[in-house]
Protein backbone atom coordinates (compact mmCIF):
# COMPACT_ATOMS: atom_id res chain seq x y z
CA UNK A 1 0.00 0.00 0.00
CA UNK A 2 2.78 2.41 0.90
CA UNK A 3 4.70 1.56 -2.27
CA UNK A 4 1.74 2.25 -4.49
CA UNK A 5 1.14 5.51 -2.63
CA UNK A 6 4.74 6.61 -3.28
CA UNK A 7 4.40 5.81 -6.97
CA UNK A 8 1.22 7.88 -7.17
CA UNK A 9 2.94 10.82 -5.46
CA UNK A 10 5.90 10.66 -7.87
CA UNK A 11 3.55 10.52 -10.87
CA UNK A 12 1.70 13.47 -9.45
CA UNK A 13 4.94 15.44 -9.07
CA UNK A 14 5.96 14.65 -12.63
CA UNK A 15 2.53 15.76 -13.84
CA UNK A 16 2.84 19.02 -11.94
CA UNK A 17 6.34 19.65 -13.34
CA UNK A 18 5.12 19.02 -16.87
CA UNK A 19 2.24 21.40 -16.24
CA UNK A 20 4.56 24.08 -14.92
CA UNK A 21 6.88 23.78 -17.92
CA UNK A 22 3.93 23.94 -20.28
CA UNK A 23 2.54 27.02 -18.59
CA UNK A 24 5.97 28.74 -18.76
CA UNK A 25 6.25 28.12 -22.50
CA UNK A 26 2.66 29.19 -23.17
CA UNK A 27 2.78 32.10 -20.68
CA UNK A 28 -0.06 30.54 -18.78
CA UNK A 29 -0.66 31.55 -15.20
CA UNK A 30 0.87 29.21 -12.64
CA UNK A 31 -0.80 28.17 -9.50
CA UNK A 32 0.31 30.01 -6.38
CA UNK A 33 1.33 26.89 -4.51
CA UNK A 34 3.58 25.51 -7.35
CA UNK A 35 7.06 24.27 -6.21
CA UNK A 36 10.32 24.47 -8.28
CA UNK A 37 12.86 21.69 -8.26
CA UNK A 38 16.39 22.94 -9.35
CA UNK A 39 18.38 20.66 -11.66
CA UNK A 40 22.33 20.81 -11.74
CA UNK A 41 25.60 20.09 -9.83
CA UNK A 42 25.61 21.23 -6.24
CA UNK A 43 27.57 20.67 -3.10
CA UNK A 44 31.03 19.05 -3.09
CA UNK A 45 30.73 18.10 -6.75
CA UNK A 46 30.46 21.77 -7.68
CA UNK A 47 33.48 22.67 -5.55
CA UNK A 48 35.57 19.87 -7.11
CA UNK A 49 34.58 21.02 -10.59
CA UNK A 50 35.63 24.60 -9.84
CA UNK A 51 38.89 23.33 -8.33
CA UNK A 52 39.77 21.26 -11.40
CA UNK A 53 38.88 24.14 -13.73
CA UNK A 54 41.09 26.48 -11.70
CA UNK A 55 43.94 23.91 -11.66
CA UNK A 56 43.67 23.47 -15.43
CA UNK A 57 43.75 27.24 -15.91
CA UNK A 58 46.87 27.59 -13.73
CA UNK A 59 48.56 24.72 -15.60
CA UNK A 60 47.81 26.37 -18.93
CA UNK A 61 49.22 29.68 -17.72
CA UNK A 62 52.42 28.03 -16.41
CA UNK A 63 52.80 26.01 -19.60
CA UNK A 64 52.38 29.13 -21.73
CA UNK A 65 54.93 31.01 -19.61
CA UNK A 66 57.45 28.16 -19.87
CA UNK A 67 56.95 28.00 -23.64
CA UNK A 68 57.54 31.74 -23.99
CA UNK A 69 60.65 31.49 -21.76
CA UNK A 70 62.08 28.59 -23.80
CA UNK A 71 61.46 30.46 -27.04
CA UNK A 72 63.22 33.50 -25.62
CA UNK A 73 66.19 31.58 -24.19
CA UNK A 74 66.72 29.38 -27.27
CA UNK A 75 66.22 32.41 -29.51
CA UNK A 76 63.77 30.73 -31.83
CA UNK A 77 63.17 32.63 -35.05
CA UNK A 78 61.70 31.90 -38.44
CA UNK A 79 65.19 31.10 -39.81
CA UNK A 80 66.35 28.80 -37.04
CA UNK A 81 67.19 28.45 -33.37
CA UNK A 82 69.84 30.43 -31.47
CA UNK A 83 73.17 30.34 -33.32
CA UNK A 84 71.73 27.85 -35.78
CA UNK A 85 70.38 29.25 -39.03
CA UNK A 86 68.79 27.16 -41.76
CA UNK A 87 69.59 28.56 -45.20
CA UNK A 88 69.20 27.35 -48.77
CA UNK A 89 72.81 26.17 -48.87
CA UNK A 90 72.66 24.28 -45.58
CA UNK A 91 73.02 25.05 -41.88
CA UNK A 92 74.91 28.07 -40.57
CA UNK A 93 76.30 28.27 -37.04
CA UNK A 94 77.23 31.56 -35.40
CA UNK A 95 79.70 31.77 -32.52
CA UNK A 96 80.91 28.73 -30.55
CA UNK A 97 79.08 25.45 -31.09
CA UNK A 98 79.52 22.26 -29.08
CA UNK A 99 78.76 18.79 -30.47
CA UNK A 100 78.34 16.05 -27.88
CA UNK A 101 77.82 13.27 -30.43
CA UNK A 102 79.51 12.48 -33.78
CA UNK A 103 78.91 14.99 -36.56
CA UNK A 104 78.41 13.77 -40.13
CA UNK A 105 78.75 16.50 -42.76
CA UNK A 106 79.87 16.82 -46.35
CA UNK A 107 81.52 20.25 -46.18
CA UNK A 108 82.40 22.72 -43.42
CA UNK A 109 83.07 26.38 -44.26
CA UNK A 110 83.91 29.27 -41.96
CA UNK A 111 82.85 32.87 -42.35
CA UNK A 112 84.78 34.95 -44.82
CA UNK A 113 86.19 37.22 -42.12
CA UNK A 114 87.04 34.58 -39.48
CA UNK A 115 88.99 31.31 -39.33
CA UNK A 116 87.56 27.86 -38.70
CA UNK A 117 88.52 26.53 -35.26
CA UNK A 118 88.01 22.91 -34.19
CA UNK A 119 88.63 22.49 -30.47
CA UNK A 120 88.42 19.56 -28.07
CA UNK A 121 89.55 18.85 -24.51
CA UNK A 122 91.32 15.63 -25.59
CA UNK A 123 91.86 15.43 -29.32
CA UNK A 124 90.28 16.22 -32.67
CA UNK A 125 89.82 13.26 -35.02
CA UNK A 126 88.66 13.49 -38.62
CA UNK A 127 87.70 10.19 -40.28
CA UNK A 128 87.03 9.40 -43.93
CA UNK A 129 85.06 6.29 -44.86
CA UNK A 130 84.01 4.65 -48.09
CA UNK A 131 80.50 3.65 -49.13
CA UNK A 132 80.83 0.42 -47.12
CA UNK A 133 81.67 2.29 -43.92
CA UNK A 134 85.31 1.20 -43.86
CA UNK A 135 87.91 3.65 -42.58
CA UNK A 136 90.08 4.94 -45.45
CA UNK A 137 91.76 7.95 -43.84
CA UNK A 138 92.18 9.46 -40.40
CA UNK A 139 93.68 12.69 -39.06
CA UNK A 140 94.15 12.98 -35.30
CA UNK A 141 95.32 16.15 -33.55
CA UNK A 142 96.29 15.28 -30.00
CA UNK A 143 98.07 16.91 -27.10
CA UNK A 144 101.42 15.27 -27.91
CA UNK A 145 101.33 14.47 -31.63
CA UNK A 146 99.52 14.95 -34.92
CA UNK A 147 98.90 11.63 -36.65
CA UNK A 148 97.71 10.99 -40.19
CA UNK A 149 96.72 7.52 -41.33
CA UNK A 150 96.15 7.20 -45.07
CA UNK A 151 97.63 5.69 -48.20
CA UNK A 152 99.22 8.95 -49.31
CA UNK A 153 99.74 12.25 -47.46
CA UNK A 154 100.16 15.44 -49.51
CA UNK A 155 100.71 19.12 -48.75
CA UNK A 156 99.95 21.44 -51.69
CA UNK A 157 100.57 25.11 -52.36
CA UNK A 158 97.54 27.37 -52.13
CA UNK A 159 98.34 29.33 -55.29
CA UNK A 160 98.96 26.76 -58.01
CA UNK A 161 98.25 23.48 -56.21
CA UNK A 162 101.83 22.32 -56.56
CA UNK A 163 102.81 19.40 -54.31
CA UNK A 164 105.13 20.68 -51.58
CA UNK A 165 105.34 17.48 -49.56
CA UNK A 166 104.06 13.97 -50.18
CA UNK A 167 104.62 10.72 -48.33
CA UNK A 168 103.57 7.13 -48.89
CA UNK A 169 104.92 3.67 -48.13
CA UNK A 170 107.53 3.82 -50.90
CA UNK A 171 108.98 7.34 -50.77
CA UNK A 172 108.81 10.85 -49.38
CA UNK A 173 108.88 13.71 -51.88
CA UNK A 174 109.65 17.35 -51.07
CA UNK A 175 108.60 19.64 -53.91
CA UNK A 176 109.61 22.98 -52.39
CA UNK A 177 112.25 25.10 -54.10
CA UNK A 178 114.47 24.99 -51.03
CA UNK A 179 114.77 22.68 -48.01
CA UNK A 180 116.01 24.61 -44.99
CA UNK A 181 117.17 22.94 -41.77
CA UNK A 182 117.67 25.40 -38.90
CA UNK A 183 118.43 22.97 -36.07
CA UNK A 184 121.73 23.17 -34.23
CA UNK A 185 122.48 19.52 -34.98
CA UNK A 186 121.61 19.87 -38.66
CA UNK A 187 119.91 17.08 -40.57
CA UNK A 188 120.55 13.46 -39.60
CA UNK A 189 120.01 10.75 -42.23
CA UNK A 190 120.11 7.10 -41.25
CA UNK A 191 120.65 5.87 -44.80
CA UNK A 192 121.80 7.21 -48.15
CA UNK A 193 120.68 10.57 -49.54
CA UNK A 194 120.21 11.27 -53.24
CA UNK A 195 120.16 14.89 -54.37
CA UNK A 196 121.34 16.79 -57.45
CA UNK A 197 122.45 19.89 -55.54
CA UNK A 198 123.61 20.73 -52.02
CA UNK A 199 124.00 24.42 -51.25
CA UNK A 200 124.51 26.44 -48.09
CA UNK A 201 122.84 29.72 -47.22
CA UNK A 202 124.51 32.92 -48.45
CA UNK A 203 127.44 33.91 -46.21
CA UNK A 204 127.19 30.56 -44.42
CA UNK A 205 129.43 27.49 -44.48
CA UNK A 206 128.31 24.12 -45.79
CA UNK A 207 129.38 21.20 -43.65
CA UNK A 208 128.84 17.50 -44.28
CA UNK A 209 129.86 15.43 -41.29
CA UNK A 210 129.73 11.83 -40.15
CA UNK A 211 130.85 11.84 -36.48
CA UNK A 212 131.47 8.12 -36.06
CA UNK A 213 131.45 6.63 -39.57
CA UNK A 214 132.64 7.44 -43.08
CA UNK A 215 131.12 9.92 -45.50
CA UNK A 216 130.73 8.90 -49.13
CA UNK A 217 129.61 10.90 -52.13
CA UNK A 218 128.90 8.88 -55.26
CA UNK A 219 127.58 9.76 -58.70
CA UNK A 220 127.73 7.72 -61.91
CA UNK A 221 128.59 10.76 -64.02
CA UNK A 222 130.93 12.55 -61.65
CA UNK A 223 131.07 14.54 -58.43
CA UNK A 224 131.89 18.23 -58.68
CA UNK A 225 132.94 20.33 -55.70
CA UNK A 226 133.62 24.00 -56.39
CA UNK A 227 134.37 27.06 -54.29
CA UNK A 228 133.91 30.09 -56.52
CA UNK A 229 135.05 32.72 -54.02
CA UNK A 230 137.00 30.78 -51.42
CA UNK A 231 139.31 27.89 -50.61
CA UNK A 232 138.73 24.16 -50.86
CA UNK A 233 140.36 22.15 -48.09
CA UNK A 234 140.51 18.41 -47.55
CA UNK A 235 142.09 17.25 -44.28
CA UNK A 236 142.35 13.84 -42.70
CA UNK A 237 144.18 12.17 -39.85
CA UNK A 238 145.71 9.37 -41.91
CA UNK A 239 146.18 8.87 -45.64
CA UNK A 240 144.53 10.99 -48.32
CA UNK A 241 143.99 8.94 -51.47
CA UNK A 242 143.42 10.39 -54.94
CA UNK A 243 142.70 7.53 -57.31
CA UNK A 244 141.60 7.41 -60.92
CA UNK A 245 141.10 3.91 -62.30
CA UNK A 246 140.89 4.76 -66.01
CA UNK A 247 141.75 8.44 -66.30
CA UNK A 248 144.31 10.82 -64.89
CA UNK A 249 144.72 13.17 -61.98
CA UNK A 250 145.03 16.71 -63.35
CA UNK A 251 146.37 19.56 -61.22
CA UNK A 252 146.02 22.98 -62.86
CA UNK A 253 147.10 26.10 -60.97
CA UNK A 254 149.46 29.04 -61.17
CA UNK A 255 151.61 27.41 -58.53
CA UNK A 256 151.61 23.94 -57.02
CA UNK A 257 153.19 23.54 -53.60
CA UNK A 258 154.06 20.30 -51.84
CA UNK A 259 154.93 21.01 -48.25
CA UNK A 260 156.82 18.95 -45.66
CA UNK A 261 158.49 16.70 -48.21
CA UNK A 262 161.45 14.77 -46.79
CA UNK A 263 164.94 15.87 -47.92
CA UNK A 264 167.33 13.21 -49.06
CA UNK A 265 171.11 13.37 -48.71
CA UNK A 266 173.61 13.44 -51.58
CA UNK A 267 177.38 13.37 -51.19
CA UNK A 268 179.71 14.59 -53.98
CA UNK A 269 183.32 15.72 -54.02
CA UNK A 270 182.48 18.70 -56.15
CA UNK A 271 179.70 19.95 -53.90
CA UNK A 272 180.44 22.64 -51.41
CA UNK A 273 179.33 21.72 -47.94
CA UNK A 274 179.71 25.24 -46.70
CA UNK A 275 177.34 26.84 -49.26
CA UNK A 276 173.69 27.27 -48.28
CA UNK A 277 171.37 25.04 -50.31
CA UNK A 278 168.36 26.91 -51.75
CA UNK A 279 167.44 24.78 -54.74
CA UNK A 280 166.23 21.17 -54.55
CA UNK A 281 165.34 18.53 -57.04
CA UNK A 282 162.04 16.66 -56.82
CA UNK A 283 162.63 12.94 -56.89
CA UNK A 284 160.22 10.03 -57.18
CA UNK A 285 160.91 6.64 -55.68
CA UNK A 286 159.91 3.43 -57.49
CA UNK A 287 157.07 3.01 -54.99
CA UNK A 288 155.72 6.48 -55.81
CA UNK A 289 157.07 8.42 -52.85
CA UNK A 290 158.26 11.99 -53.39
CA UNK A 291 161.27 13.54 -51.72
CA UNK A 292 163.65 16.43 -52.25
CA UNK A 293 167.30 16.12 -53.11
CA UNK A 294 169.84 18.97 -53.21
CA UNK A 295 170.15 20.19 -56.76
CA UNK A 296 173.50 19.83 -58.48
CA UNK A 297 175.02 19.96 -61.93
CA UNK A 298 173.39 16.64 -62.76
CA UNK A 299 170.56 14.67 -61.25
CA UNK A 300 171.02 13.93 -57.59
CA UNK A 301 168.11 11.50 -57.27
CA UNK A 302 169.15 8.06 -56.04
CA UNK A 303 166.89 5.04 -56.07
CA UNK A 304 168.85 3.63 -53.18
CA UNK A 305 168.04 6.59 -51.00
CA UNK A 306 167.07 5.84 -47.46
CA UNK A 307 163.70 7.56 -48.02
CA UNK A 308 162.79 5.13 -50.80
CA UNK A 309 163.70 2.21 -48.57
CA UNK A 310 161.21 3.28 -45.90
CA UNK A 311 157.89 1.56 -45.86
Curated annotation (Swiss-Prot):
One of its GO terms (cellular component) is cytoplasm. Keywords: Cell membrane, Cytoplasm, Cytoskeleton, Disulfide bond, Glycoprotein, Membrane, Signal-anchor, Transmembrane, Transmembrane helix. One of its GO terms (biological process) is membrane organization. It is a single-pass type II membrane protein. It is found in: Cell membrane, Sarcolemma; Cytoplasm, Cytoskeleton. Glycans are attached at residues 75, 123. Residues 72-311 are extracellular. Residues 1-50 are cytoplasmic. Its main location: membrane. Coiled coil: none annotated. Expressed in the heart, skeletal muscle and arterial vascular smooth muscle. Pfam families: Sarcoglycan_1 (PF04790). Disulfide bonds join 285-301. It comes from the Eukaryota. The chain crosses the membrane at residues 51-71. Belongs to the sarcoglycan beta/delta/gamma/zeta family. Component of the sarcoglycan complex, a subcomplex of the dystrophin-glycoprotein complex which forms a link between the F-actin cytoskeleton and the extracellular matrix. May play a role in the maintenance of striated muscle membrane stability. This is Zeta-sarcoglycan. It comes from Mus musculus (Mouse).
